[in-house]
Amino acid sequence: GINIMKKPAIITALFAILIICCQCTMKSPEKEAVNHNYMWFDCEANYATLSHPDSIRFYLQKTKDLGFGNVVVDMKSIMGEVLYDSQIAPYMGDWEGVERSRDYDMLGYFIEYGHEMGLKVFGSLNVFAGGHNFFNRGIIYNEHPEWQSIVYRPDGSLVPISEIKTNYNGMLNPSNPEVREYQKNILVEFAERYPDADGIIFDRLRYDNITSDFSPLSREQFEAWSGITVENYPEDI
């Protein structure tokens, strides 16, 4: 047993050890606070406003003042047109009467001014989007109509997505190897052009929804993958 005369000394020693342990825990290295607030700059809604470097600086400062630490800049629209001088994709050089020259480097200004203010700047790309059905504009209307999704309608019909004017998204068929190769080349080009961007965000990296794609190509791919011949297409899907 413990001698009763030694108990106060033991209790004091244990209490001292407890205090030291607590202090060690409290003195863990401080971590830099991470700002998870993102401001998204849509390329169509802000086309006119962001066509001037001083406007970009102005709204970046307002963004920072509001407590945001990150900005996302749309650089490839749902039409498949890009907002930088690409050697692959068509350039979005105008929108609703406002024009831009190909040498206008919008994201370059965002990166320069944003980094000066301590903001992180990300570029956003709409990957499998290729047309704006409300404006009949985009690569599915011009360069590559054969790449658009085929939609299975409630009435049983199969319709190109460009003909569905209640849906503004003119989506491509992600299962088409030509589409995937084309998009991959754009992503590589973009990453190499903007190495100082803090990251790339992929938007619409998907099918339009469960009603697409029902093209002959997708049917062939499904049957090859599953080993099943679909006798009643698309009813049995």
PLM region spans:
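Bacterial N-terminal signal peptides
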Residues: 12-21
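Bacterial Sec-dependent signal peptides at the C-terminal "C-region" and cleavage site
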Residues: 20-33
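Active-site-adjacent "subsite" loops/lids of carbohydrate-active enzymes
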Residues: 32-50, 123, 128-194
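Hydrophobic faces of well-ordered beta-strands that scaffold small-molecule active sites
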Residues: 37-41, 71-73, 121-123, 200-202
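Aromatic- and glycine-enriched glycan-recognition loops and surfaces
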Residues: 48-66, 93-116, 181, 185
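Catalytic domains of carbohydrate-active enzymes, especially glycoside hydrolases
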Residues: 55-81, 195
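Aromatic-lined substrate-binding rim segments of carbohydrate-active enzymes
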Residues: 78-126, 237
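Aromatic- and acidic-residue-enriched segments that line the glycan-binding/catalytic groove
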Residues: 83-95, 129-165, 204-236
